[in-house]
Amino acid sequence: DTSVVICTIGFFSNLRDLLQSGADEYSDLSGKELVAKKVKRLVSMAGLFPEGKEFNVYCDVPASKVVAEEWPTEIVFSGFEIGNVILTGKKLVQMNVENSPVKDAYALCFAEGDPEGRMSWDHTAVLVAIKGYEPYFDVERGTFHVVDDEGTNNWVANPNGRDLRLIEKMPPTEVASLIENYMMHQRSIK
């Protein structure tokens, strides 16, 4: 029924394991068949575009290759270059709120030398998984490849490709402000 969107902000190890799993007591479908039936898309913070090496790809190259080659539905890639210029956290650490693990983590980052904000690599993937890429980003359709055993990736533009990669559309400062507003949200207690 393609009702599921999966977002990954780390290595592809668990998704490789899913693809290679067989039927079990929960489903007669293999992992790959289950993904094909249930998953609309995978949104992933992975890769450096148009070509390069990125941490989430090169830390488990075999898993990255399996997912790149065998994932049965669309993959949207939020590359390193997207989140690298979207800096968040500056307003968050100035909030008058106590006992906030997010605020505390960002305060530590600022103390370690990120005075203008922390790069938002993972945040962009989460934003797109929940809200979609419009109006924040443009996309280019193509194919993501892991080209060597060192985890280098490249991108081949192709209007019929399975994959999408995010391309800057809104100014990074506007995307940062939007993400930071979500990060600063405080639930109302009734």
Language-model segments: residues:
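N-terminal acidic, glycine/proline-rich low-complexity segments
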Residues: D1-K190
